[in-house]
């Protein structure tokens, strides 16, 4: 019909580009048990650039506050090592399967470097997306909610 404009839907890649902050993270074990691996109020950032680069950081709610990052007790250092994950690399988007495929170039968890991962986008709009990591390094399925930084 003349005079009727049809809005084109954005691609998943166009929707995901930008900076996001972590709202919720829940891991599900094989037996169905759910845990909050990053605490009750997790902190984190996820950034996707238009040229296919990403960076992600996850922080536990209750990290020890130490005066010198080169110091700390063994227990404090262990809590920090277990309570922080940062990674970066490149990504591609599989529009048909609604997945983000990541190639880790570096990570605070050194085992990730040189590996690949998949994040299934289960829901997305202009302000929020939900994703699932079907196979974490701890053997769980991780579901997370991210809100766009304005």
Question: Where do the language-model regions lie?
Answer:
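Lipid interaction determinants
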Residues: 3-150
């Amino acid at each position: 019909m003349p005079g009727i404009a049809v809005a084109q839907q954005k691609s998943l890649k166009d929707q995901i580009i930008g900076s996001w902050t972590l709202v919720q993270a829940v891991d599900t074990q094989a037996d169905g048990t759910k845990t909050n691996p990053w605490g009750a109020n997790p902190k984190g950032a996820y950034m996707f650039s238009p040229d296919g680069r990403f960076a992600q950081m996850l922080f536990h709610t209750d990290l020890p506050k130490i005066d010198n990052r080169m110091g700390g007790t063994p227990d404090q250092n262990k809590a920090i090592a277990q309570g922080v994950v940062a990674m970066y690399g490149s990504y591609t988007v599989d529009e048909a399967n609604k997945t983000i495929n990541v190639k880790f170039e570096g990570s605070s968890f050194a085992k990730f470097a040189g590996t690949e991962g998949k994040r299934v986008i289960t829901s997305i709009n202009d302000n929020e997306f939900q994703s699932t990591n079907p196979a974490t390094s701890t053997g769980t399925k991780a579901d997370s909610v991210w809100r766009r930084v304005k």
